[in-house]
Amino acid sequence: MIKGINHITYSVSNIAKSIEFYRDILGADILVEGETSAYFNLGGIWLALNEEKNIPRSEIKYSYTHIAFTISDNDFEDWYIWLKENEVNILEGRDRDIRDKKSIYFTDLDGHKLELHTGSLEDRLSYYKEAKPHMNFYI
C-alpha cells in the first residue's frame, strides 16, 4: 500500500543557482548539499535536486505538469510581489472561477512549473460538484 509521497526529484542544469532559488526565493530549508545534488524540506516535502547539465529542456514549457504548494489567501499578494521583485518567471495562469481559489504559476531556473495555490482539495471538489455535472465523484 502506498502511504504518501516520499520525495520529489528535479533534474537541474546548475545546482548552485538552483539551491539559491529554492532556498532564497521559496524559503526551503536546505538539508544536504553536495557537488551535484541537494536535499530540501519544502513545506514538509522532501525535495531533491540533481544536477544534469547536458539534457534537453526545451519541451518542458509545453507541459502542464507541475507541483502546487499551499499558501494562505492572506499571503497571496505578498507572494506575487516577492516573486516579481526577485525576477521569477511568472506564467500567465489559466482562467478560473473564484470558487477554484487563486494560483500563481511560475518556473524555476530550469523551466519546472510550480504553483502557489490558496485552495484545498475539498475546495476543488466542492466547486467541481457544482460546476461539472459530467464528472463522477467517488468521495
From Swiss-Prot:
Its EC number is 2.5.1.-. One of its GO terms (molecular function) is transferase activity, transferring alkyl or aryl (other than methyl) groups. It comes from Staphylococcus epidermidis. Mg(2+) binds at H7, H66, E115. Coiled coil: none annotated. It is found in: Cytoplasm. The lineage of its organism: Bacteria, Bacillati, Bacillota, Bacilli, Bacillales. The keyword Metal-binding applies. The active site is at E115 (proton donor/acceptor). It holds the Pfam family Glyoxalase. This is Metallothiol transferase FosB. Transmembrane segments: none annotated. InterPro entries: Fosfomycin_Res_Enzymes, Glyas_Bleomycin-R_OHBP_Dase, Glyas_Fos-R_dOase_dom, Metallothiol_Trafse_FosB, VOC. PANTHER family: FOSFOMYCIN RESISTANCE PROTEIN FOSX, LYASE, PUTATIVE-RELATED-RELATED. Residues 4-119 form the VOC domain.
